[in-house]
Design a protein with these regions (language model features):
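Acidic (Asp/Glu-rich) sequence patches and key acidic residues
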Residues: 1-103, 112-113
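Short, low-complexity polar/charged micro-motifs in intrinsically disordered terminal tails
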Residues: 108-110
């Protein structure tokens, strides 16, 4: 298995509480519950690293290999209201399991997939 190093920019949330629920359910062998969450995640934009150390949900602006030439994104050209609307749409399928308590944020991070 080859590892891929990626860089992502997302307008959304770190869904730490949801990630912990998934890890706890998996450790308790409640696989049906975990599968239900994954089914809903598949209806959303999300990024989960290979070790499942973090989970981000929202409007994915950019997600590329760190060796690729990513598109240039100018902060002053971002329509935050539109991205917020899209971010909230992305969490709609997950509301049975998790709801954010804060507004979405612009988050940049690197991860391994």
């Amino acid at each position: 298995m080859s590892l891929e190093y990626r860089s992502a920019l997302i307008f959304g949330w770190e869904a730490e509480e949801l990630r912990r629920k998934m890890a706890e359910a998996e450790s308790e062998k409640r696989y049906e519950y975990v599968d239900k969450i994954y089914e809903q995640l598949d209806k959303s934009n999300f990024i989960l690293d290979i070790n499942e150390d973090f989970l981000y949900v929202g409007k994915v602006i950019s997600d590329c290999d760190i060796y690729d030439n990513a598109d240039t994104i100018f902060i002053d050209e971002i329509n935050f209201k539109e991205f917020a609307r899209e971010a909230y749409e992305q969490i709609e399928p997950l509301k049975e399991f998790w709801k954010p308590t804060d507004p979405p944020q612009l988050i940049h991070f690197c991860y391994v997939r």
